[in-house]
């Protein structure tokens, strides 16, 4: 949540640096105009260092990051890609756009992929799994990675919500073969729109880098119009303005995550007074706390809780009001899912729906104020009709 909250003079300084040195907004070429200023390239290097991975590729969005990741592993029409029922619609859209077949798993009490259901869904056609760290809480990565390795399938981490988080000391996104990130306006760090893909494997990185730029190899010794091409592709290039903002935002990431964790701790002290159950966090998790999620006893109470929070001026972000955009059981508009799961898609994921239908989320700001605590407390008192 806080990325847009902390945009300031640092971002402006990085942008000004572009216009003070030729004003080139395209990430490649025009060397004679830009005085050595390549913001996207600089952002990629700094991000890869931060995530402790050798390769990083900046793209136009988190959705683009997923599509580029799938292009790198060369999806064929019969290939199946497994992902979870609770995720933003873009995860499944990227699979469909890559010509893959989306296979959906249930979630568990982490609100992330259920490892047991993941293994059940693996077939001879399974090419990869995309695990999503929803709202900043890590999935059960040890179990999921072990299963992926056993069956020799690619592990892709959709880390759109988890930038800055860790699992057993490893940055989220760097646990699998490929990690994807989103920098849209609502994420922990933002470039307005934008994304990043990180790799351990040079071959996968090279494929992705070419594919995201119409197949260009971007040989620095050749003018762009004479550059060789290794494949077909599309245009998912990040521009220099986004790269400049990304550099400034990355410097603030640790401060932001620390602030979110501090705010979450204070809100948790309020939630513990009420008859609700907190979302499970796997052992070894260092969450980003994009949002705090808790469960109440039934769906009607969840709606009541949401309404009370909203009436006090406390947002609930995506649970439960934006569930249709974040639950595969609502996506009957996609022919590929309709063909696989039928019209009553929701009934195919009863465990997931049971969790989500009783869940409420509170978005976390790094700028915690005592007034917010009072509002949350008042809303929960009214919800449960009991003063604590």
Task: Show which residues each predicted segment covers.
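Active-site phosphate-binding strand-loop segment of PLP-dependent enzymes
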Residues: 109-191, 196-203
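Conserved PLP-binding active-site segment in aminotransferase class I/II-type PLP enzymes
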Residues: 1-72, 76, 97-98, 149, ...
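Active-site region of PLP-dependent enzymes
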Residues: 29-30, 35-36, 162-168, 175-291
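Conserved PLP-anchoring active-site segment centered on the Schiff-base-forming lysine
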Residues: 64-123, 128-130, 309
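Conserved PLP cofactor-binding pocket of PLP-dependent enzymes
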Residues: 215-225, 266-270, 306-360
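Short amphipathic alpha-helices in soluble, non-transmembrane regions
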Residues: 208, 303-312, 376-380
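Short, conserved charged micro-motifs
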Residues: 299-305, 369-374
């Amino acid at each position: 949540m806080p990325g847009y909250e902390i945009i300031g003079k640092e971002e402006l300084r990085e942008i000004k640096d572009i216009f003070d040195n030729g004003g080139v907004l395209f990430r490649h070429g025009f060397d004679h105009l830009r005085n050595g200023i390549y913001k996207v390239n600089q952002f990629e290097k700094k991000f890869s260092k931060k995530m402790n991975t050798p390769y990083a590729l900046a793209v136009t969005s988190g959705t683009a990051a997923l599509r580029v990741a799938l292009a790198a592993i060369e999806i064929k029409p019969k290939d199946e890609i497994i992902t979870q029922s609770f995720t933003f619609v873009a995860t499944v859209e990227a699979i469909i756009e890559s010509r893959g077949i989306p296979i959906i798993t249930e979630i568990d009490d982490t609100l992330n992929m259920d490892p047991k259901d993941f293994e059940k869904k693996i077939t001879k056609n399974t090419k990869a799994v995309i695990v999503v760290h929803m709202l900043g809480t890590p999935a059960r990565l040890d179990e999921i990675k072990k299963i992926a390795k056993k069956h020799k399938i690619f592990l892709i981490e959709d880390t759109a919500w988890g930038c800055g988080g860790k699992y057993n000391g490893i940055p989220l996104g760097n646990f699998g073969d490929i990690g994807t990130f989103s920098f849209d306006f609502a994420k922990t760090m933002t470039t307005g729109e934008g994304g990043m893909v990180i790799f351990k494997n040079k071959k996968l990185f090279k494929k992705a880098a070419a594919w995201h730029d119409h197949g260009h190899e971007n040989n620095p010794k050749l003018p762009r119009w004479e550059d060789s091409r290794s494949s077909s592709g599309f245009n998912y290039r990040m521009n220099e303005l986004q790269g400049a903002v990304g550099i400034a935002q990355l410097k603030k990431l640790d401060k932001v995550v620390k602030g979110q964790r501090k705010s979450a701790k204070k809100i948790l002290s309020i939630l513990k007074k009420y008859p609700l159950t907190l979302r499970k966090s796997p052992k070894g998790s260092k969450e980003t706390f994009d949002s705090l999620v808790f469960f109440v006893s039934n769906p009607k109470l969840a709606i009541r809780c949401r309404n009370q929070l909203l009436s006090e001026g406390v947002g609930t972000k995506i649970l439960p009001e934006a569930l249709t955009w974040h639950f595969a059981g609502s996506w009957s508009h996609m022919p590929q899912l309709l063909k696989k799961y039928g019209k009553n898609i929701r009934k195919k994921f009863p465990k997931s729906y049971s969790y989500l239908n009783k869940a409420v989320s509170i978005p976390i700001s790094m700028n915690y104020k005592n007034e917010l605590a009072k509002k949350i407390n008042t809303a929960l008192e009214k919800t449960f009709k009991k003063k604590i």
